[in-house]
């Protein structure tokens, strides 16, 4: 299943990362290009325990991607 998340604020980012951890293919979309570039580098702009590690793991396995398009 493919899931799109609109917005990478606290709720959108955590939801998208968690869905990808469950095995879904997730694309997170945000209009803030700087935030998207940081997320692509594995930099998490919010504090949530363990989120950065899960994000990196699922980005590397191609289940999680970020775009501003």
Residue map of PLM features:
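Structural/interface elements that position substrates and couple domains in central-metabolism enzymes
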Residues: 1-69
């Amino acid at each position: 299943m493919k899931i799109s998340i609109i917005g990478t604020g606290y709720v959108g980012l955590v939801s998208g990362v968690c869905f990808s951890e469950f095995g879904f293919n997730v694309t997170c979309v945000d209009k803030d290009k700087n935030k998207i570039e940081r997320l692509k580098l594995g930099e998490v702009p919010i504090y949530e325990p363990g989120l950065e590690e899960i994000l990196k793991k699922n980005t590397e396995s191609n289940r999680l991607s970020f775009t501003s398009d």
